[in-house]
């Protein structure tokens, strides 16, 4: 008997589940956010802007998702590594399109493989992070 092969790419259906879970969590918290899902190469796969979310969150959600996918780390962790005196100091300046604060999570198998990333923006960094974690957990 063959074991099913693991998916090596992020499907639109998977991305839509992430978006739905993020929206549900944002609504539960009574927040309006933007949610972006990118593939392993950081290309946008799905995006939603909830009613009343701030316009600045559009770009930030995508940047957080991109950061998580490209570095296979939560964007907040990348931020800690990018601080003064840290190994990735000023990575945002040398590698454009990143956001090095909480709200982005890699999608995949717990560090084994990265299928993409989800990014949430529009609330506090901690709230964005909790919504992104809900998206990953339900995806």
Residue positions per predicted region:
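Flexible, solvent-exposed loop/hinge segments and secondary-structure transition points
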Residues: 1-139
């Amino acid at each position: 008997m063959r074991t099913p092969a693991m998916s090596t790419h992020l499907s639109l259906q998977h991305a839509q589940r992430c978006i739905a879970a993020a929206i549900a969590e944002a609504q539960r918290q009574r927040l309006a956010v933007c949610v972006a899902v990118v593939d392993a190469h950081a290309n946008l796969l799905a995006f939603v802007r909830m009613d009343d979310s701030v316009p600045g969150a559009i770009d930030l959600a995508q940047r957080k998702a991109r950061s998580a996918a490209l570095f296979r780390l939560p964007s907040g962790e990348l931020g800690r590594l990018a601080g003064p005196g840290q190994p990735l100091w000023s990575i945002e300046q040398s590698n454009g399109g990143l956001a090095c604060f909480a709200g982005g999570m890699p999608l995949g198998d717990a560090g084994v493989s990265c299928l993409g990333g989800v990014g949430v923006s529009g609330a506090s960094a901690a709230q964005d992070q909790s919504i992104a974690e809900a998206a990953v957990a339900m995806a």
